[in-house]
Amino acid sequence: MHDKKFLVGLIGADIQMSKSPTLHETEARHQGLDYRYELLDFAERGLPASALPDLLDEEERRGFSGSNITHPCKQTVIAHLNRLSEDAEMLGAVNTVVFRDGERIGHNTDWYGFYENFQRGLPDVAKSHAILLGAGGAGVALAHAAIKLGIERLSIFDQDSKRAETLAGQLNDRFSRDCARATTDVGSTLRSADGLIHATPTGMKSHPGLPIDPEWLLPRHWVADIVYMPLVTELLSLAERKGCRTLRGGGMTVYQAAAAFELFTGIAPDAERMSRHFMDLCRLSA
């Protein structure tokens, strides 16, 4: 048993169903750590997302080692940090904050989580062209991972077209080639695409529904979702009925959590053990 006690958290909205506390705490027990993971939920506390600085102050005051950050704060949190890791600065989004030596340090483990999940779940799919839905805090990480995975051309759609255009420009500059563009027509873009990457809250229990017209999806498409509550979203259910290859969001959750766990503790977790435990949790809550 290690002497140090770890108190970590998750800040976000509508997060009461999150599996992160059990996922982290179970791995910590295997590692012999005294480790507690708390949820700081805007909705549960009746607070607006603008209360983010107060929740960060609370965590720091109570001696938290760090905190995960989720929707809707992955970009707004940056203004309240002292510095960013290279990945977080490059992506302009943070999903993990470490409190160390009086500083708040922002990291991004989302892109790594998606990258690892895709490599394992869809290793041999066509990657000439894919469409990304969502250019927010999660979308910027997934876009980066998509190009690193070898997707040659990425079309990006967001309800805020300027945000999609900005992300496409950032990717083209970062990778020094014309690898991304914004689109305002998902249906026609999907006709020429190999796959769809979904990075919006649509499909969560608090945001039910489909992000696309069902007719746009064809059996030849692959579909990757980041939503993991429920594990099989309406989008993935539709894709499976149509015969598409699919990638569930749970794997991304596990691999980003494993990376965050190491940032909080300095101890490398067993990611495969965490994955098995995550699937057990999903079966219990199904």
State where each predicted segment sits.
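NAD(P)-binding Rossmann-fold cofactor-contacting core
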Residues: 151-174
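N-terminal Rossmann-fold NAD(P) dinucleotide-binding loop
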Residues: 139-140, 232
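Adenosine-phosphate binding glycine-rich loop
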Residues: 226-286
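Phosphate/diphosphate ligand-binding glycine-rich loop within oxidoreductases
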Residues: 2-123
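Glycine-rich Rossmann-fold phosphate-binding loop(s) that bind the pyrophosphate
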Residues: 13, 135-136
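Rossmann-like adenosine-cofactor binding region
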Residues: 176-248
